[in-house]
Amino acid sequence: MEKEYVRLISGDGFVFILEKEIACLSGTIRAILNEGIFSEAQKNECTFPDIRATLLEKVCEYLHYNYRYKNQLDIPKFDIPPEMVLELLVTAEYLEA
């Protein structure tokens, strides 16, 4: 079966391409893509005008990390730069990631 991909677009125009299964670990992204009423679902694309690329990139890294190490016993540390912590917390809360 061929993997399905989605495009996540930051407010400053950067595009991140993820497997849909991984992107949908975010409750918000899953809701946007799985509701047929959103045009984003038709295009497999989500635009986040209020999220900068540096934050969206870190969220994408975390979604991959979460997918890879889910149900593992030996999980490496996920590093977050201290200057990014507060903004990333707000972003993760919004994305339910």
Swiss-Prot record:
One example of a Gene Ontology biological process annotation: ubiquitin-dependent protein catabolic process
Keyword Cytoplasm: yes
Any one GO cellular component localisation term in the record: cytosol
Compartments it resides in: Cytoplasm; Nucleus
CDD domains registered for this protein in UniProt: BTB_POZ_EloC (cd18321)
Major location category of this protein: cytoplasm
The keyword Cytoplasm appears for this protein: yes
Gene Ontology MF terms: protein-macromolecule adaptor activity; transcription elongation factor activity
InterPro entries according to UniProt: ELC1, SKP1-like, SKP1/BTB/POZ_sf, Skp1_comp_POZ
Keywords assigned by UniProt, alphabetized: Cytoplasm, Nucleus
Physiological role: As part of the CRL3 E3 ubiquitin ligase complex; polyubiquitylates monoubiquitylated RNA polymerase II subunit rpb1 to trigger its proteolysis; plays a role in global genomic repair. Prevents degradation of interacting proteins by the proteasome.
Similarity comment: family membership: Belongs to the SKP1 family.
Subunit structure, as described in the record: Heterodimer with pof4/ela1. Component of a CRL3 E3 ubiquitin ligase complex consisting of a cullin, the linker protein elc1, the substrate receptor pof4/ela1, and the RING protein rbx1.
Protein name, per record: Elongin-C
Source organism (scientific name): Schizosaccharomyces pombe (strain 972 / ATCC 24843)
Native organism taxonomy: Eukaryota, Fungi, Dikarya, Ascomycota, Taphrinomycotina
Gene: elc1
